[in-house]
Amino acid sequence: MNRIQRVSSWLKEAGHTAAFIHTKENVFYLTGFYTEPHERLMGLFIFQEEEPFFVCPGMEAGQARNAGWNHEIIGYADHENPWELIEKALKKRNISIHMLAVEKDSISLSRAEQLKHATGGAQFVSAEETLNQFRLIKDDNEIRLLKEAAKLADYGVEVGTAALREGISEVEVLAQIEYELKKKGIQGMSFSTMVLFGEKSGQPHGNPGTATLKKGDFVLFDLGVILDGYCSDITRTFAYKTINPKQEAIYETVLQAEKAAIEASKPGVRIGDLDLTARGIIEKAGYGDYFPHRLGHGLGISVHEYPSMSQANDTLLQEGMVYTIEPGIYVPEIGGVRIEDDVHVTKDGAVALTQYPKDLIIL
C-alpha cells in the first residue's frame, strides 16, 4: 500500500469524504514533490475511492510530474483563482464532500473559508494526528536519507571548527559553514544556523552577529541541512584555547545527560522518561534551573516534527523513530553548553546518526 492509498484507507475507516493536504512537508511525503509555494496555493485532494488530484501553480506542474506524481494535476496561472478551479473540479467529478480532513493547525482562516466555500460547506476534521502517525516511523529509504543528511551536519561542524581564529566573528564562521555545505549539494539549511561565542552561547536560540572570538569562550554550533527533502540537526559546543573548572563541570554534566538519554532510548520506553533521565542528571549537578527546554523533538521531513520529546509525553518509543536528544545548560555571564545528536531507534536500542566527536575539545 503506497502513501496515498494509506490515506484513502484511513478516510474510509474514519468515515471522512476526503482530505485536503496543503503543507509543503506533507505534500512532499505524499507526492514526492518538494517545493516552496510561498503565497501561492498548493493542495492535494485525496478521496476514499476516486482518483486524487493535485493543485499547484502552473509553472511548477512539470516539476510535480517529474517528481513522480502520476495522477491529475490542475495547474493555474497567476491571474486565475485556484479555488474556483477546485470547485469546478469537484463538480465535474460529482463529488459531494461532507467531512473534509485538513491540516487545521496550519491552514489560515482566510484559506479555510475559501476551502469551505469551494467544497460546498464541508465540515472540517483534523488530519494532523493521522499524518503525524504515518510519518512517525521511517522506512529504510528515509533512514538512508537521514543518515546522509547527518553526515553533512557533521561536516558543517568540521568546517566551523576549522574556521575559528581569535577575532573572527560569528557571522564570518557561519558564512563559511553554509558556503561549504552548499558546495556539497544540499537543498538548504534546515533552520537558521547558530554560531555563538562566549556569553551568547547561553542563549538557547541566539542570533549570530558581529561578536568576535576570544580566548576562554565557549563556541556553540547548532546547524542542519536539508538533503533530498530530509533534515538533520546537530549541536556541538567547544572551548576556545582554555577552559575554567566551572565551564568544564557544566560541559561534563551535559555530556553525561545526553549519553544517558541515548542509552535509555529503546523500544517500549516512555518518551517522557528520556527527558527525565537527562533532567535528573542536570538537576543533581545543581543546574536544573538552567535547563529551560524539552529534551528534543522528532526529525524527518521537518526539522521539528512529532513527537515532542518532553517529560509530559507518554508515547512509547518504537523501532523506526528518529528524533533529537539535546540537553543544555545555560548560565548567564558564563555561557551555555548544548550537545545534540540525531537518534534512530532500532530493535536493539538507539543509534546516533550524527557522529561528530562530543567529548570535551579545547580548540
From Swiss-Prot:
The keyword Manganese applies. Binds 2 manganese ions per subunit. The keyword Cytoplasm does not apply. Signal peptide: none annotated. Coiled coil: none annotated. Keywords: Dipeptidase, Hydrolase, Manganese, Metal-binding, Metalloprotease, Protease. Its cofactor is Mn(2+). SUPFAM superfamilies: Creatinase/aminopeptidase, Creatinase/prolidase N-terminal domain. InterPro entries: Creatin/AminoP/Spt16_N, Creatinase/aminopeptidase-like, Creatinase_N, Pept_M24, Pept_M24_MAP, Peptidase_M24B, Peptidase_M24B_aminopep-P_CS. Mn(2+) 2 binds at D222, D233, E340. Mn(2+) 1 binds at D233, H297, E326, E340. Pfam families: Creatinase_N, Peptidase_M24. GO terms for biological process: proteolysis. Its EC number is 3.4.13.-. Belongs to the peptidase M24B family. This is Putative dipeptidase YkvY.
